[in-house]
């Protein structure tokens, strides 16, 4: 088994959609980034890549590459899933936290879990997502950005045991 930790942050800005966990969330601002800036998916991908000792999302999907401009992070997650299986692993579980003062994430968490479990070909019970605020402190508390943390456990597939 292997464990990986991921973290991502993006600045909130006008004239962008807010997409988190593959869900478009109604909000007056969205996240700024080269791709769709899905902070949750980016943290999850980094945790998986870390568990596989394959670097980070900047190595695999550089923001200097026009191919990834405006990219759907769920499609990038599909690529990361292929790396998991090619290395002989499967998802054990993923536990993630979204850190945002607003909007409230609770109404969207089940859709996020469903999206992620489908792409990673794992039971929805293996995907946990929590949301918290920083009580008005820091850049997330000041509503300047949104952050996410993720930890994953990868298990060897049965054919590799």
Swiss-Prot record:
Site (Transition state stabilizer): 34, 133
Swiss-Prot/TrEMBL catalytic activity: 4-CDP-2-C-methyl-D-erythritol 2-phosphate = 2-C-methyl-D-erythritol 2,4-cyclic diphosphate + CMP
Gene Ontology molecular function: 2-C-methyl-D-erythritol 2,4-cyclodiphosphate synthase activity; metal ion binding
Cofactor: a divalent metal cation
PROSITE patterns in the record: ISPF
InterPro entries from the UniProt entry: MECDP_synthase, MECDP_synthase_CS, MECDP_synthase_sf
EC number, as in UniProt: 4.6.1.12
CDD domains the UniProt entry points to: MECDP_synthase
UniProt KW Heme keyword: no
Cofactor, free-text remark: Binds 1 divalent metal cation per subunit.
Quaternary structure and partners: Homotrimer.
Family: Belongs to the IspF family.
Protein function: Involved in the biosynthesis of isopentenyl diphosphate (IPP) and dimethylallyl diphosphate (DMAPP), two major building blocks of isoprenoid compounds. Catalyzes the conversion of 4-diphosphocytidyl-2-C-methyl-D-erythritol 2-phosphate (CDP-ME2P) to 2-C-methyl-D-erythritol 2,4-cyclodiphosphate (ME-CPP) with a corresponding release of cytidine 5-monophosphate (CMP).
Identification of the protein by name: 2-C-methyl-D-erythritol 2,4-cyclodiphosphate synthase
Native source organism of the sequence: Clostridioides difficile (strain 630)
Gene: ispF
């Amino acid at each position: 088994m292997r464990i990986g930790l991921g973290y991502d942050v993006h600045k909130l800005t006008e004239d962008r959609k807010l997409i988190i966990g593959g869900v478009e969330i109604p909000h007056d601002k969205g996240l700024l980034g080269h791709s769709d800036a899905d902070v949750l998916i980016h943290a999850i991908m980094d945790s998986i890549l870390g568990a596989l000792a394959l670097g980070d999302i900047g190595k695999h999907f550089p923001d200097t590459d026009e191919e990834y401009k405006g990219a759907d992070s769920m499609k990038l997650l599909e690529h990361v899933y292929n790396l998991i299986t090619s290395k002989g692993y499967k998802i054990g579980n993923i536990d993630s936290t979204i850190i945002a003062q607003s909007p409230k994430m609770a109404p969207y968490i089940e859709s996020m879990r469903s999206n992620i479990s489908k792409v990673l070909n794992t039971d929805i019970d293996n995907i946990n997502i929590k949301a918290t605020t920083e009580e008005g402190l820091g850049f997330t508390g000041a509503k300047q950005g949104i952050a996410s943390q993720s930890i994953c456990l990868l298990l060897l597939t049965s054919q590799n045991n």
